[in-house]
Design a protein with these regions (language model features):
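A ubiquitous short alpha-helical element
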Residues: 7, 271, 290, 353-359, ...
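Hydrophobic packing residues in well-ordered alpha-helices of helical domains and bundles
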Residues: 13, 46, 359, 366, ...
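A glycine-rich phosphate-binding loop feature that marks nucleotide/adenosyl-phosphate handling sites
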Residues: 66-71, 265-269, 317-319, 351-360
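Acidic, turn-prone loop/beta-hairpin segments
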Residues: 349-374
């Protein structure tokens, strides 16, 4: 993106960080710590993870082929390479992943790979990089995945299949001009730690940053080291490989840190049968929705059509219907009637000496709803939880 706009990478980082922050605030979403993976704290945590994995024998150096653009005379990051997916034959697969079938890839696996910089066929040159030894870490993941039968089927089935097929060692450094420096000097300054490895470490570094800001530098340990602490990773299905296998592999290799409790990945939101994507011009951007709808209407509609088990279609007509029939006519009407009664009769209502049968039944129903809906929330079945809330 920086190359496309003719600016420095840090300018792109700052631009989108600011935009995302603005979007979340407009959607009334709050947080304890909103940060980036550009902080000194994050770099320190990444270096600590890297060195510990190196000491534990889960990182080593290997020679490999990396995509190279002969026109621009530079090595290409994986996402600067596009071609046909060798598994599903999708024509616009990237060098690290296919958006169509969610397979993780290496650039040399693509059929007819081309450079996104020049549009010319990519060449492959030998270079040396640090690799995460997933071939060893897979042994730690198999028994752990067997305990995750409560995960969504498409997540656990994919993760088990990925590990069962045999994990390949994966390069965690690249010939890049911009990124986090490698904490050892073996390969020179022209190589950096690659984003797919260090980005997921942001969950841990953000927690450590939050602890420092709270005044208790060890507070993060309560959430990452105590056995009873739980962690849930809410992602899209294109990120399943990184959160169900690769991040757990890093945690297992490091040791002393909790593995994910659940990875409730959603499938895709579709617009006229196509995956919603602002970058590809499919569907509206969040900015467009925010300019036309109130935050509650957006959040309610998205929660109503969450693609928890399969892809879901989102249409303008559906947003209008749910807003008018459910939020306004049903929920809004109930709230309006209740508040009107309270406003008009607040001085006439006395505390009863005892509850009538109808009152007791209503309270029992409320208790039942709280328990039933809570079970759905704990199981991360949020769409059903919302449906049951509206039904009650």
């Amino acid at each position: 993106r920086a190359d496309e706009e003719g600016v420095e990478p840090i300018d792109i980082v700052n631009k989108y960080h600011s935009e995302f922050l603005d979007y979340w605030e407009k959607l009334s979403i709050s947080w304890d710590n909103y940060t980036t993976t550009m902080t000194d704290n994050h770099k320190e945590v990444v270096h600590d993870i890297f060195l510990k994995l190196l000491d534990n024998g889960f990182i080593d150096k290997q020679k490999t082929l990396q995509a190279f653009d002969p026109i621009d005379n530079k090595f290409l990051p994986d996402r600067y390479v596009e071609g046909q997916c060798p598994k599903c034959e999708y024509g616009e697969a990237r060098g690290d992943q296919c958006d169509n079938c969610s397979s993780t890839l290496d650039p040399e696996e693509l059929i007819n790979p081309v450079s996104k910089l020049s549009g010319n066929p990519a060449e492959f040159k030998e270079t040396e990089h640090f690799f995460l030894k997933l071939s060893l870490l897979g042994e730690k993941l198999s028994p752990w995945l067997e305990t995750k039968e409560n995960w969504r089927p498409h997540v656990i089935n994919w993760a088990k299949s990925f590990v069962k097929d045999g994990l390949k060692d994966r390069a965690i450094t690249r010939d890049l001009e911009w990124g986090i420096d490698i904490p050892v000097d073996d390969l020179g300054d022209e190589k950096k730690i690659y984003v797919w490895f260090e980005a997921v470490i942001g969950y841990l570094s953000a927690s450590i940053e939050w602890a420092k800001n709270s005044g208790d530098e060890d507070a993060w340990k309560e959430w990452w080291q105590k056995e009873e602490a739980e962690s849930y990773y809410f992602i899209g299905k294109d990120n399943v490989p990184f959160h169900s296998v690769i991040w757990p592999a890093i945690l297992a290799g490091y040791g002393q840190l909790n593995m994910p409790t659940n990875v409730p990945a959603n499938q895709y939101i579709l617009v006229k049968g196509q995956k919603a994507s602002a970058s590809r011009g499919v569907g509206k951007s969040l900015a467009d929705y925010l300019s036309e709808w109130e935050p509650d209407a957006i959040r309610y509609t998205l929660a109503s059509v969450l693609p928890e088990q399969s892809d879901s279609e989102l249409t303008e007509e559906e947003m209008v219907r749910r807003n008018n029939e459910e939020l306004v006519a049903t929920w809004g009407n109930l709230v309006q009637r209740v508040f009107t009664q309270i406003q008009n009769n607040k001085d006439a209502i006395k505390t009863p000496s005892s509850l009538e049968t109808v009152d007791e039944e209503l309270l029992k129903e409320a208790d039942k709803a709280f328990i039933e809906i809570g079970k759905y929330i704990e199981a991360v079945e949020l769409k059903t939880a919302l449906q049951e809330s509206m039904r009650y």
